[in-house]
From Swiss-Prot:
TPR repeats lie at residues 27-62, 63-96, 97-130, 131-164, 165-198, 199-232, 268-301, 302-335. The keyword Glycoprotein does not apply. Keywords: Repeat, TPR repeat. It holds the Pfam family TPR_16. It comes from Methanocaldococcus jannaschii (strain ATCC 43067 / DSM 2661 / JAL-1 / JCM 10045 / NBRC 100440). This is TPR repeat-containing protein MJ0941. The keyword Repeat applies.
């Protein structure tokens, strides 16, 4: 036991008094990087930065140390410092597309999409099928409203990954924004050929068909979402109810309204639809209660004010009708219900 202690002390003394060489510095730098990696993995960012700085004192151009430092700084929220670190790394090694993507993300997080785009283009110039760079580039282009470039980017990605359903859906969404409904519909049909139960594709197809005036086809999309796939998105339910009312499908409309109100009891649109439904069924007192609920939730909702006025007029309550017609006129610039 004593012998072992002496040996350990001896080797410890040798380490303390060894002559420094480039090889020794490199090995020690590697050891510090490994320690930094472990601390970073465990979420100890301060310790990770300590070890990575120790490594960089020994090897200032140690690529992995700089990369880990950039990661740790970005995890701490020190975005500017992280960008500086990654750019220092790029001054030594500019051919790594992953580094360009990280810098691009940091510029994006700081709101500088123009610089982010430059970084993603650099990454794609090195690796032209780098999917992460493409996806991040599309986010920037959409944020900047550069839709023509965005569509080119989608098309390029789809030449490499033609079965990538989310990209077909995103392309359709942009085409819809541009008013190119038929082209958008082609993209959604392609997405649904590849994945018949894709929720986003079905929802967007329903929205698109509704905009195109194809109410029955649109309703089938929302019904499939809600009834077959059990997707209880409140927006999908609202769309379905509005289509049912337009198609005079009143029985199903009431069922869907109740599904929606179970999810969100204070949904203004659904309470308004319920009032409209009861009004059509001749249940005027029930309709008035629903419209009153709408006004309680959103006092400036003109359609509800007008609907109450209309019912009072039908019932011969002219004084109440005039009151609500006047309220509607007074609130015409305050309405948030349209």
């Amino acid at each position: 036991m004593i012998d072992k202690i002496i040996i350990l002390y001896f080797y410890g003394d040798m380490r303390m008094n060894r002559k420094r060489t480039p090889r020794v510095d490199t090995l020690e730098a590697v050891a510090n990087v490994l320690r930094a990696y472990r601390e970073l993995f465990e979420g100890n960012l301060i310790k990770a930065l300590y070890y990575v700085d120790k490594a960089l004192e020994l090897e200032p151009d140690f690529y992995l140390a700089l990369f880990l430092k950039g990661l740790a700084l970005s995890a701490k929220g020190e975005i500017k410092e992280a960008i500086t670190t990654f750019e220092e790394l790029l001054s030594y090694e500019s051919k790594n597309p992953i580094t360009w993507v990280f810098v691009g993300q940091l510029y994006g997080m700081s709101g500088n999409c123009d610089e982010a785009l430059k970084c993603y283009n650099k990454a794609l110039g090195i690796e032209n099928r780098f999917l992460s760079a493409f996806l991040l580039k599309t986010i920037c282009l959409e944020f900047l409203g550069e839709y023509d470039e965005l569509l080119k980017c989608y098309n390029e990605v789809l030449t490499y990954t033609p079965n990538f359903v989310p990209m077909w859906v995103k392309k359709a969404e942009i085409l819809r924004k541009l008013g190119r409904y038929e082209d958008a519909l082609l993209c959604l049909n392609r997405a649904l050929e590849l994945k018949p139960h894709d929720k986003n594709a079905l929802y967007l197809k329903g929205v698109l068909l509704k905009r195109m005036g194809k109410f029955r086809e649109a309703l089938e999309c929302f019904k499939k979402l809600i009834d077959e796939l059990n997707v209880k998105w409140i927006d999908a339910i609202r769309h379905a109810v509005s289509l049912m009312l337009a198609l005079d499908d009143l029985k199903d409309a009431e069922r869907y309204i109740n599904i929606g109100l179970e999810i969100r009891k204070d949904d203004v649109a659904l309470w308004y639809f319920k009032g409209e439904l009861y009004e059509r069924l001749g249940k005027l007192d029930e309709a008035l209660k629903c419209y009153e609920k709408v006004i309680e939730l959103q006092p400036h909702y003109i359609k509800a004010l007008l609907s109450k006025a209309r019912i009072y007029e039908r019932q011969g309550n002219i004084e109440a009708a005039i009151e609500y017609y006047n309220k509607a006129v007074e609130n015409i610039h305050k309405d948030h219900g349209e």
